[in-house]
Amino acid sequence: MYLNIAYPRNGTVKQFEISDEVLRRVQLQDYRLGNEVDGAIFGSEFKGYIFRLRGGSDKDGFPMVPGVLASSRVSLLVKRGAIGFNTFRGYQGERRRKNVRGCVLASDIALVNVTISKVGDQPIEGVTDTTAPRRLGPKRASKIRKLFNLSRTEDVRKYVVRRRVVKSGKKDRLKAPKIQRLITPRVKARRAKKAKDAIAKVRASAAERREYLRLIASNRRALRQRDHSKKHTQKVHAQRAEVAAFQKK
């Protein structure tokens, strides 16, 4: 079995091979993805470490899926973006049946991914004793504020992490990322205009509705007046006919 150990604090990852003799002394069925385990079960060099199980795959490359309480392969009906069904495949709303592994460890698991939750006494070579600096800084304005502890009134553009681009035969230059979700006066003006247009649209719609209701009311009033006039005329004619018939007698 291979063990991928990641230390997000330093940004380092390294793969180790665990012998079968070590695995025979461990009941792998007692562990599942998401659990924190003692690093000593994978070897004495990891004594004192606490690992969190993040993922893995079996000997045929089928990935482990969290939440599936099984130690073998299962066939799941999954949608796009799920484990085993890439987003760029299939159609929108389509579901496919894919073979995946459960979240319970077993003896036929070939690779396990873990992260270090607690550092032990002895450093792990290439993982905890080194640091891999990030090549790129944050792009989002809120994350830049969080990184430099800035207030909402301070200008974020002054604190963008720039990197130096070196090319042979050319002058070195600094390259800065485009800040995402940056609130500028232009953005504020656009949002204010959008809100103003929305309010004007609602007011215009309300005015049109009032005019429409007024028109309906006037039409109904005119219809009632016509009906009343018609009934009155019919009543007058009926009375005149009764008077004429009475006079003939």
Swiss-Prot record:
SMART domains this protein is in?
Ribosomal_S6e
Q: Name the predominant localization.
A: cytoplasm
Output compositional bias ranges, type Basic residues.
Answer: 223-238
Locations listed in the record: Cytoplasm; Nucleus, Nucleolus
Q: List the disulfide bonds.
A: none
Its post-translational modification remark reads:
Ribosomal protein S6 is the major substrate of protein kinases in eukaryote ribosomes.
Give a GO biological-process term: translation
Q: Does the keyword Phosphoprotein apply?
A: yes
Look up the domain of life of the source.
Eukaryota
Renumbered to this chain, region (Disordered) spans 223-249
For this UniProt record, the keywords arranged alphabetically read as follows: Cytoplasm, Nucleus, Phosphoprotein, Ribonucleoprotein, Ribosomal protein
This chain's function reads: Component of the 40S small ribosomal subunit. Plays an important role in controlling cell growth and proliferation through the selective translation of particular classes of mRNA. Part of the small subunit (SSU) processome, first precursor of the small eukaryotic ribosomal subunit.
Protein name as annotated: Small ribosomal subunit protein eS6
The organism is Leishmania infantum
